């Protein structure tokens, strides 16, 4: 199977079954099977982008170490370690495999993906309960809008259609989506140049963006991150603030330098196999964190870093610093914005959601890898490279370097 064909099917299945109808399908392992399929497909295909393989090997060695470390520490049962392992490696496997394969798509393939996404969203809205918070529609519309602009953003009318798709996500009523929407509008319409760490204007722009995000999400931000931290006794806090405080204790005090290990804290595995750490830190009586009702145990991504400690935190930052440097090398400004939004959306959702580790975050990692590898270059049916279907930065429209890594098997 051609790489472009494989990824066309992957994208077609992704949004309907990993986001929109994931809870209704009655088949909760489709994202794991899709990830496994992508890994196997990567092994049998000729890949490019080999400069990233050292990073892949480093990550593999690191995860093997953490599996052994977790089994030796034995804070939770071995089953929790392996359940958590498959969830922790998923986003990075998706990113690395997509990066190595660097898929390109024909115009027809792009249209098929986008039409199915729009139809799926419309069908989802038929049974949507308006006025009730629903994170699913926000996540689906945001990713669909980004992909639409990624594929079709060469004309302003397509850019505005992409914005309209993202705007539909406001129906979710979720504060974190309001923050993502502010970020999206700011980067699409306000940002005129790449963010440079040595430029004062960058810090002003970032400051204004953060202020706007906090303003539009203040109610929840204040409840969780201002008033939520005012209790001195962790056991008297709400679930999310208590989880963040305890994560800090685990990382910087009690489990230096490698953390508490896989399957022990703030993850689905720690919920399925109720982690003893929740008794140790007095969290087992907090509403949403109890053994009987623990729906808020896997409530945010960043506290999960407690499982990896200071060392894991270092490698997490190292991974994203490398991605940020790669994003800054993208020559086409609109694609630069999309890649940056993928990264920032993962961070924003990570404060109050575990999409980073779930199937719902797979699209961000795929799209980021495609942006970094120049997958926005369109291929015709006879494999002739067409001009990029994006708005070019007037000063940085050279694409000679971004075409490296095209689908050599298509």
Predicted regions, residues:
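Alpha-helical transmembrane segments of multi-pass inner-membrane proteins
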Residues: 91-192
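Structural signal for the C-terminal ends of transmembrane alpha-helices
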Residues: 40-51, 98-107, 147-155, 186-196, ...
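Long extracytoplasmic/lumenal interhelical loops at the membrane interface
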Residues: 234-238, 242, 260-308
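Transmembrane alpha-helices of multi-pass inner-membrane enzymes
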Residues: 36, 338-392
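Hydrophobic transmembrane alpha-helices and their immediate junctions
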Residues: 48, 54-56, 304-347, 384, ...
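Flexible juxtamembrane loops connecting transmembrane helices in multi-pass membrane enzymes
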Residues: 28, 214-246, 250-253, 264-273
């Amino acid at each position: 199977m051609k790489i472009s064909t494989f990824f066309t099917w992957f994208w077609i299945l992704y949004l309907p079954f990993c986001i929109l109808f994931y809870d209704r399908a009655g088949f909760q392992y489709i994202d794991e099977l899709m990830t496994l399929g992508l890994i196997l497909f990567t092994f049998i295909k000729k890949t490019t982008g080999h400069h990233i393989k050292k990073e892949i090997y480093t990550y593999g060695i690191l995860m093997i170490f953490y599996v052994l470390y977790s089994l030796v520490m034995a804070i939770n049962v071995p089953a929790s370690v392996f359940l958590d392992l498959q969830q922790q490696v998923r986003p990075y496997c998706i990113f690395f495999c997509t990066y190595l394969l660097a898929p390109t798509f024909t115009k027809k393939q792009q249209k098929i993906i986008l039409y199915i996404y729009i139809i799926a969203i419309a069908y989802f809205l038929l049974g949507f309960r308006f006025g009730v918070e629903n994170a699913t529609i926000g996540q689906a519309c945001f990713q669909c809008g980004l992909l639409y602009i990624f594929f079709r953003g060469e004309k302003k009318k397509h850019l505005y259609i992409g914005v309209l798709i993202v705007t539909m996500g406001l129906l979710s009523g979720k504060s974190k989506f309001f923050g993502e929407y502010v970020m999206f509008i700011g980067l699409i319409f306000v940002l005129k140049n790449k963010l440079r760490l040595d430029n004062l204007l960058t810090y002003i722009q970032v400051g204004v963006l953060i202020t706007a995000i906090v303003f539009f999400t203040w109610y929840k931000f204040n409840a969780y991150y201002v008033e939520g931290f005012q209790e001195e006794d962790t056991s008297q806090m709400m679930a999310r603030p208590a989880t963040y405080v305890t994560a800090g204790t685990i990382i910087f005090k009690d489990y230096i330098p490698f953390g508490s290990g896989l399957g022990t804290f703030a993850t689905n595995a720690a919920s399925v196999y109720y982690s003893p750490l929740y008794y140790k830190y007095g969290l087992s009586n907090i509403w949403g964190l109890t053994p009987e009702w623990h729906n808020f145990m896997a409530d945010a991504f960043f506290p999960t870093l407690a499982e990896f400690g200071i060392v894991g935190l270092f490698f997490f930052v190292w991974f994203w610093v490398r991605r940020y440097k790669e994003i800054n090398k993208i020559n086409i400004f609109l694609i630069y914005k999309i890649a940056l939004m993928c990264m920032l959306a993962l961070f924003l959702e990570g404060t109050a959601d575990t999409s980073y580790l779930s199937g719902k975050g797979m699209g961000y990692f795929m799209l980021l890898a495609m942006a970094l590898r120049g997958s926005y270059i369109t291929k015709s049916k006879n494999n002739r490279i067409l001009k990029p279907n994006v708005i070019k930065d007037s000063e940085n429209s050279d694409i000679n370097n971004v075409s490296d890594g095209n689908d050599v098997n298509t």
